[in-house]
């Protein structure tokens, strides 16, 4: 679904066959690669992380390259998260992005009970990092521990990772030359997830307020009532809320994700710095109550 939304953001106006699927490339290929990154970031595992798994530790792990390994790790993370284990620095990134401290990559809280203001701050930090990366402020060799953004420091400051290791581990030189587009695609993924009911609970937009930054403006989406956390959700129900049918139900609303995404593409093309464009992001992820606790929403998993 992310590919279709992204192609529509890049002004694909056709039907599903035109705007979705592997052959739909209205958006730049590296942007689409970045959109996929949040769900399937490439990574390698230390010996203590891969014990007992069917993973080739010397090779980059992605769903496409090591599907059995990937699925085994995902199910292990799922079982442990259901027992209220938490994942963070020192754990494999797959555990962290779906069940741990990096759930903000999907516009979600890292745990039930996390205050909306905390999740919002993490998401805004990621938007800042990925926007600045998309504008060429960092290079492949920039070490994440040297990026002075609190969410990046908290997530990756313990490591020697570079942007190369984060975004393009195991990739060829072609994708690495398009680092800026990869980063922008990752930003769009988080934006798109902030419209999915399994990720957030938003008010309906009235269409009367606008998000503005310089010459860029669009109708403001509804404010966020609650961020959800994935740990105790029913995955099938979550998946239904991520479906094309769910997207199309909100596609005509003012401030929808395609309208907002197009505004961000225009802002990037205009060369807007983070300091100039940040009001747009603050508007898009505005929250109703700063202390609203995260939870599974209407997607609670049944008790085992």
Predicted segment positions?
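Catalytic glutamate of the conserved HExxH
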Residues: 186, 190, 194
């Amino acid at each position: 679904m992310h590919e279709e939304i992204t192609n529509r953001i890049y002004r694909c106006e056709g039907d599903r066959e035109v705007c979705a699927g592997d052959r739909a490339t209205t958006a730049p290929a590296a942007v689409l690669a970045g959109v996929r990154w949040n769900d399937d970031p490439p990574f390698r595992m230390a010996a203590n992380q891969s014990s007992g798994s069917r993973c080739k530790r010397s090779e980059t792990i992605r769903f496409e390259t090591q599907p059995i390994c990937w699925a085994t790790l995902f199910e292990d993370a799922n079982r442990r998260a259901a027992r209220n284990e938490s994942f963070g620095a020192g754990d494999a990134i797959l555990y962290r992005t779906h069940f741990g401290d990096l759930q903000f990559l999907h516009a979600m809280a890292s745990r039930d009970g996390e205050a909306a203001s905390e999740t919002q701050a993490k998401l805004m930090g990621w938007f800042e990092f990925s926007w600045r990366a998309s504008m060429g402020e960092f290079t492949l060799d920039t070490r994440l521990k040297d990026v002075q953004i609190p969410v990046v420091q908290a997530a990756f400051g313990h490591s020697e990772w570079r942007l190369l290791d984060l975004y393009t581990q195991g990739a060829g030189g072609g994708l690495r030359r398009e680092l800026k587009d990869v980063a922008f695609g990752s930003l769009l993924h988080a934006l798109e997830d902030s419209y999915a009911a399994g990720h957030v609970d938003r008010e309906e937009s009235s269409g009367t307020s606008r998000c503005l930054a310089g010459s860029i403006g669009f109708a403001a989406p509804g404010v966020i009532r609650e961020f959800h956390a994935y740990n105790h959700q029913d995955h099938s129900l979550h998946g239904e809320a991520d479906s094309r049918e769910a997207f199309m139900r909100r596609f005509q609303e003012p401030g929808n994700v395609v309208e907002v995404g197009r505004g961000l593409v225009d802002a990037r093309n205009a060369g807007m710095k983070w300091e100039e464009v940040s009001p747009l992001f603050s508007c898009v992820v505005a929250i109703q109550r700063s202390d609203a606790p995260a939870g599974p929403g209407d997607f609670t998993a049944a008790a085992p």
